[in-house]
């Protein structure tokens, strides 16, 4: 009997230690406060040009947070997700699909959602109304004979990473809803880096079509002033939630609040607004929650079925 009591007592001690360890782990999992903040962007245009544009953001964040800040541009959508998952990056400017993936795989948390000016079709002229969504477009060269989604069968299309909402997921899902399967209808996809390259691939005749975000043609107006006449939209998708500012899942709530305030203050400043506007056409940031991205999850499921 004494032996049984000793065994039970030992088990209770072990159980207590396990419980304490688990409790401390949970606390540690939400208690990370960076001493040197790492911020990363995904490339929406030429990576070198974009890197030069975002570098000044580091100083503005340092002034707000009073810690060293490093700002970089990732090579693609997947690398930033993996970098946040492996805790090499603290803050990511994640497009909606990349956020959904990062949240599912690594518990990444969304803090803010971007606001942009809306666009009027057909020439993508910006309105004065701020919105928290955007749309994807499928564009072709004018006079190509491609007038609708069915005409894309057998054609060559410039696309972005498969985690890109406007550069892949939403256009592919919408094509599927209209009976065009990107894997089975003899369509050739060409992955390019940045929406400026996607637009120019159509403009120069290197591809028949491109998946872009609405307004992306404006990125190349300086080099191709007649782009609106030569590259036209044949399809515009439903609304896509705007880009996020997201953080690694173990970041402390207190530091999350500091970041929210810092980014909102920067967006309101002259220098800060110039940076975010030139990089992603962001005009400001509003608080966001995970359920805001359920539409993205719906379209992700459609694309996943296509790939099965």
Question: Language-model features: where?
Answer:
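Sec-dependent N-terminal signal peptides of Gram-positive bacterial secreted proteins and lipoproteins
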Residues: 3-26
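Extracytoplasmic small-molecule ligand-binding "clamshell" domains
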Residues: 28-100
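An extracytoplasmic/periplasmic, membrane-proximal ligand-sensing/linker region
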Residues: 31-56, 246-308
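Bilobed "Venus flytrap"/periplasmic-binding protein-like clamshell domains
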Residues: 40-63, 74, 115, 127-199
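Short beta-strand-to-loop elements that line the ligand-binding cleft
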Residues: 68-75, 90-93, 184-194, 232-235
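Acidic, polar ligand-binding/catalytic clefts
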Residues: 82-151
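A ligand-binding cleft/hinge motif common to bilobed small-molecule-binding domains
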Residues: 96-107, 176-177, 201-203, 208-228
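Short beta-strand->loop
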Residues: 108-131, 185-188, 221-239
């Amino acid at each position: 009997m004494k032996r049984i009591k000793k065994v039970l007592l030992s088990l209770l001690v072990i159980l207590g230690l396990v419980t304490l360890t688990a409790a401390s782990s949970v606390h540690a999992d939400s208690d990370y406060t960076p001493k040197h903040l790492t911020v990363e962007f995904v490339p929406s245009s030429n990576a070198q040009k974009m890197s030069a544009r975002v570098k000044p953001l580091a100083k503005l964040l340092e002034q707000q947070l009073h810690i060293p800040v490093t700002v970089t541009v990732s090579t693609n959508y997947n690398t930033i997700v993996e970098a946040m998952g492996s805790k090499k990056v603290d803050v990511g400017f994640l497009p909606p699909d990349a956020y959904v993936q990062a949240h599912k795989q690594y518990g990444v948390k969304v803090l803010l959602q971007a606001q942009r000016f809306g666009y009027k079709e057909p020439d993508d002229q910006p309105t004065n109304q701020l919105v928290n969504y955007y749309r994807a477009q499928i564009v072709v060269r004018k006079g190509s004979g491609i007038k609708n989604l069915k005409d894309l069968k057998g054609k060559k299309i410039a696309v972005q990473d498969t985690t890109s909402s406007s550069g892949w997921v939403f256009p592919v899902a919408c094509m599927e809803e209209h009976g065009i399967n990107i894997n089975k209808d003899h369509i050739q996809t060409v992955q390019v880096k940045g929406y400026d390259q996607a637009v120019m691939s159509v403009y120069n005749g290197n591809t028949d079509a491109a998946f872009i975000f609405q307004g992306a043609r404006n990125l190349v107006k300086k080099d191709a002033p007649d782009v609106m006449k030569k590259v036209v939209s044949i399809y515009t998708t439903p609304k896509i939630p705007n880009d996020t500012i997201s953080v690694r899942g173990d970041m402390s709530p207190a530091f999350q609040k500091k970041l929210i305030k810092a980014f909102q203050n920067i967006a309101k400043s002259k220098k800060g607004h110039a940076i975010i506007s030139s990089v992603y056409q962001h005009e400001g940031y509003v608080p966001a929650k995970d359920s805001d991205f359920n539409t993205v999850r719906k379209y992700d499921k459609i694309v996943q079925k296509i790939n099965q």
